[in-house]
């Protein structure tokens, strides 16, 4: 009987540890100040990306909100066969920035950031800065999120 209870305790404890490691979206997704207050590392990543790519944090965060709703594990919904059988995803986009695999590979090659991870906010913020800076060089203003998008 004690062994049985110990198994459940270990399983429950492991589940709690895994859940605590998951990154949750911000509690107040409509307020960038509250997001940065809650997630200081996101603020630091946004400022770092701004210094490197000259893209303001509000533009960067608007991309993240639009693409993933601040979810690290965001992916496109699976297509359905016969309306209910899950099938393939329509694209390879993953993470905060919803970067496609090919575009992400281009970013890693151009920046030398070969260990970048699409589910890491810091890397996604840098990617968005890189991507938006491409739009700037095509004639769009760095502060115009709609045009850069």
Describe each region flagged by the PLM.
Residues 22-149:
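Catalytic glycan-binding domains that act on GlcNAc-containing polysaccharides
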């Amino acid at each position: 009987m004690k062994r049985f209870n110990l198994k459940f305790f270990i399983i429950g404890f492991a589940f709690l540890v895994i859940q605590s490691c998951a990154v949750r979206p911000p509690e107040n997704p409509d307020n960038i100040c509250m997001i940065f207050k809650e997630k200081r590392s996101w603020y630091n990543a946004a400022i770092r990306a701004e210094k490197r790519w000259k893209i303001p944090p509000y533009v960067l965060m608007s991309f993240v909100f639009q693409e993933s709703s601040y979810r690290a594990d965001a992916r496109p919904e699976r297509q359905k066969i016969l309306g209910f059988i899950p099938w393939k995803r329509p694209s390879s986009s993953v993470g905060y920035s919803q970067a496609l695999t090919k575009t992400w590979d281009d970013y890693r090659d151009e920046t030398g950031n070969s260990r970048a991870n699409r589910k890491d906010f810091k890397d996604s913020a840098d990617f968005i800065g890189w991507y938006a800076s491409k739009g700037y060089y095509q004639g769009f203003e760095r502060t115009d999120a709609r045009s850069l998008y």
